[in-house]
Amino acid sequence: MAALMATNALAIDSMLPALPEIGEALGIAVVSDRQWIFTAYLLGFGASQIVYGTLADRFGRRTVLLAGLFVYAAASVMATFAGTFQAMMIARVLQGIGAGGTRVLTVSIVRDCYSGRQMARVMSLAMIVFLTAPILAPSIGQLIVLFADWRWIFAFLALFGIVALVVVAWRLPETLHEENRVPIAVGPIAHAFAESLTNRLAVGYMLAMTFIIGGLFGFINTAQQLFVDVFKAEATFTVIFAAIAAFMGLASFLNSRIVGRLGMRRVSHAALIGFIVITTAHAAIAFSMTERLWIFAVMQAATMFCFGLVASNFGAMAMDPLGHVAGTASSVQGFVSTVGGALIGFFIGQHFDGTSVPNTLGFAVCGLIALAMVLVAERGRLFRPHQQPV
């Protein structure tokens, strides 16, 4: 499960060190337009999830997952040979469409087998492995461009997709039995979509996750510009980025150890408050124009630690009341959080002004809005130990 989830992180973060080379080769004149390499992928990734759940509920998890991995691998090959910016955008959208299945199906497979705190614990363990991908991906990209053309990054992604396809075909059993499959019919699908979009807890945590992810995507969109152009840290960019990302993995590991005892709400609500305090302080430092590289790295690492505690639990809480329509619910939530997060992140990225202010302020605002969504979901009460009727 974790390796499948890593296909997404690899397709994003391995690009970071090669952005200048990709931009030059494809004739991208405006530096900020390079962000479309990420955004095009994320839009395909998010939009495709709206159909994956319905297909998975009808045909089973395994078949649909195999189809998605095939599209991912084929699109990676297309990107390897793209000769224009437009061709790259098409390949990246298709790559995202293929990878969308890995997000929906992994969550649905876990939900088929677990629920509640046990689901959160399993997701946290998967996130530990998953989060090693953004730690290693920039270094993989950097290593490739040191010895070969940037196109070999996409060749690596194609190989990863093929290996994942073979492993799933060989080792993964079907988790949705025939008697539990839902036919493709307008009535049941509309009912499942309506339930996914009207459950207070599910919608509240889905929207909260959307804004938290939006802040993260804003950071990823501008990471290369921040470290290289603002802090002049080109030589140490991948190392610092990996260290920051490692704090997400550390948080997910910690979450897997404490969530069973403390509960999802206590852990994630405390982490969200910490997220807001840290990002607000970071924004104040950025506004003072006295920020140094080490300050940025420390504050960003603390932010990512809180993000790691929030992410696994918010996703699990959004899915928990919708187990009987897990495939469709996972699709709806994946579509909203990814497409919404991508657009928020693109908005933050396009406001890059040569300082860290847009990035840090974007994180703080997204955190505050996420808190508002949680308060709506929980009817104004935080840290509740058990789920109440909604």
List the model feature ranges, each with a label.
Residues 71-78, 86-94, 294-300:
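Paired small-residue
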Residues 46-86:
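Conserved MFS/SLC helix-loop-helix module at the cytosolic interface between two early adjacent transmembrane helices
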Residues 175-205:
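Juxtamembrane intracellular "pre-TM" segments in multi-pass secondary transporters
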Residues 87, 116, 121-172, 176, ...:
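Helix-loop-helix hairpin linking two adjacent transmembrane segments in secondary transporters
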Residues 266-314:
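C-terminal transmembrane helical hairpin of 12-TM major facilitator-type secondary transporters
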